[in-house]
């Protein structure tokens, strides 16, 4: 979505990708960027970490977006670029554990963005600005905009488990969340072409579904949006499909959920989008 919104800056834009391959490269190509416009490092895992895994040790969390921030800053300096443009949304600010400020997506949050910018100002300041273009929007608004670009449907991918094979595993909370989000705007035939099956017609995803939707249930530790966005998407998906509903939609409809508030006019003013990148032409309508 960011690449499409910034089309008028195409000639001066580079795509920064760590370990460029598969879906990331294909999306860049669809946006009109050939190999000469794709830059980024190769990232490898220390063999010692793999050996510890073999010994039974668990992996810690990798704040990948923080890795992107610091490494992209180096590339921006080397290539003489003024802006590092991310695509993190307002929804990434929501915490994951009820009653506690625990955010699995901290390195995608406004808090991290502010912290990183402060660090740059204090230690590295040379005019390079790091910001997220999509921060003012909810992920629901981004999805609404994304579906207007069907050329990306065959190539985009956002599943951690399927990242190495450029596929949707269609068996995790992230896949279910994206399926729900898009179900507000797309029919099941189109969604099945993307995911390989109708995820809303699977009883085994009840617990994951409830974690994404219900208050009092902790959200899955995946990069997913807010429960308000999920409820709005489900409401729209149910209206779109009429009386013939897949299992999870039918189950949810029986709870008689209240009509959710529209997010069409949502706009998070706590953002660092600079001028001349004006938001007057970036509304999600």
Residue ranges and their predicted role:
Residues 165-177:
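Local cysteine-cluster metal-coordination motifs and their immediate loop/turn environment
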Residues 1-151, 178:
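ATP-dependent adenylation/nucleotidyltransferase module used to activate substrates
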Residues 280-285:
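Conserved small/polar residues in nucleotide/adenosyl-binding loops
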Residues 148-167:
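Immediate flanking context of iron-sulfur cluster ligation sites
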Residues 216-260:
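Short flanking/linker segments adjacent to small metal-binding domains or redox-active Cys/His motifs
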Residues 160, 204-210:
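Predominantly late transmembrane helices and immediately cytosolic-facing juxtamembrane segments
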Residues 161-163, 191-202:
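Active/binding-pocket-proximal capping segment
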Residues 175-191:
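Iron-sulfur (Fe-S) cluster-binding segments and ferredoxin-like electron-carrier domains
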């Amino acid at each position: 979505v960011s690449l499409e919104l910034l089309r008028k800056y195409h000639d001066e834009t580079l795509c920064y990708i760590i370990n460029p391959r598969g879906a990331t490269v294909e999306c860049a190509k669809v946006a009109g960027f050939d190999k000469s416009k794709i830059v980024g490092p190769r990232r490898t895992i220390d063999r010692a970490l793999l050996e510890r895994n073999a010994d039974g040790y668990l992996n810690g969390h990798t704040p990948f977006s923080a890795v992107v921030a610091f490494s992209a800053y180096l590339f921006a300096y080397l290539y003489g670029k003024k802006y590092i443009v991310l695509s993190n949304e307002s929804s990434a600010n929501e915490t994951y554990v009820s009653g506690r400020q625990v955010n699995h997506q901290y390195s995608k949050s406004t808090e991290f963005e502010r912290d990183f910018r402060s660090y740059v100002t204090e230690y590295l300041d040379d005019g390079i600005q790091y910001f997220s273009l999509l921060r003012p929007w909810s992920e629901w608004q981004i999805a609404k905009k994304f579906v207007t670009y069907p050329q990306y449907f065959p190539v985009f991918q956002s599943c951690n488990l399927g990242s190495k094979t450029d596929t949707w595993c269609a068996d995790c909370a992230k896949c279910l969340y994206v399926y729900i989000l898009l179900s507000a705007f797309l029919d099941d035939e189109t969604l099945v072409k993307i995911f390989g099956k109708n995820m809303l017609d699977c009883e085994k995803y009840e617990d994951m579904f409830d974690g994404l939707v219900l208050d009092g249930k902790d959200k899955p530790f995946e990069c997913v949006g807010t429960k308000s966005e999920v409820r709005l998407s489900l409401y729209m998906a149910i209206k779109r499909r009429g009386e013939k509903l897949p299992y999870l939609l039918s189950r949810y409809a029986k709870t008689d959920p209240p009509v959710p508030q529209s997010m069409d006019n949502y706009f998070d003013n706590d953002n660092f989008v600079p001028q001349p990148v004006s938001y007057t032409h970036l509304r999600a309508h």
